[in-house]
A protein has these predicted regions:
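Low-complexity, intrinsically disordered terminal/linker segments enriched in charged
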Residues: 103-107, 111, 117-120, 138-160
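Hydrophobic/aromatic beta-strand elements that line small-molecule binding cavities or substrate pockets
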Residues: 98, 122-128
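Positively charged n-region of N-terminal signal peptides that target proteins for export
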Residues: 1-4
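Surface-exposed, charged secondary-structure patches
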Residues: 24, 58-119
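Bacterial N-terminal signal peptides
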Residues: 6-16
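Stable alpha-helical elements in mature extracytoplasmic
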Residues: 28-33, 54, 147, 151
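Sec/Tat signal peptide C-region and signal peptidase I cleavage site
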Residues: 19-23
Length: 160
């Protein structure tokens, strides 16, 4: 009886670990990012990182940093002088290439490569699953590095 229970437990563990939904988890992040970037066409209206809909794309920790930074810089541009999703102030993104890979349960890393107004741009995202939905946990881009770190550093500097 004990052997049968152990065998069933092992079989159940193998099923859970090999279940296709785990493999598809990171791939489900691509439609999320495509939806985010869909607004970055001429005439589009991307989500304001400090607006009420920001929670639909940013994870709670990054959103808290963005909102705290906004208060800390007292109306100055600061780290967010450009939109971190497109690394731009003006946009007309026509073609985007996305690659996504799993970084463990509920975490993924994505790279977006695109041309915006003739400028080749690469932006990397750390994504986290929040309530079963993908959210941006950090953004990495040339010249900025980690958005989370840049915001935290700016908040610390403003407090001095």
């Amino acid at each position: 009886m004990r052997l049968a229970c152990s065998a069933l437990t092992a079989l159940a563990c193998m099923f859970v670990l090999a279940h296709p939904s785990r493999a598809q988890d990171a791939r489900s992040a691509e439609p999320f990012l495509r939806q985010v970037y869909a607004q970055y066409k001429a005439g589009g209206t991307p989500i304001d990182p400090t607006g009420p809909d920001a929670r639909t794309i940013y994870d709670p920790a990054l959103l808290a940093l963005i909102l705290t930074d906004r208060k800390a810089v007292n109306g100055e541009a600061g780290v967010l002088d450009a939109d971190p999703i497109c690394a731009c102030q003006d946009y007309d993104i026509k073609t985007i290439k996305l690659s996504v890979r799993s970084k463990g349960a509920g975490r993924a890393e994505a790279t977006a490569s695109f041309h915006n107004l003739g400028q080749a741009t690469v932006v990397r995202f750390d994504l986290s699953s929040v309530g079963g939905n993908w959210r941006i946990a950090d953004i990495h881009q040339k010249g900025l590095g980690s958005l989370r770190k840049a915001l935290a550093d700016e908040i610390a500097s403003a407090g001095k």
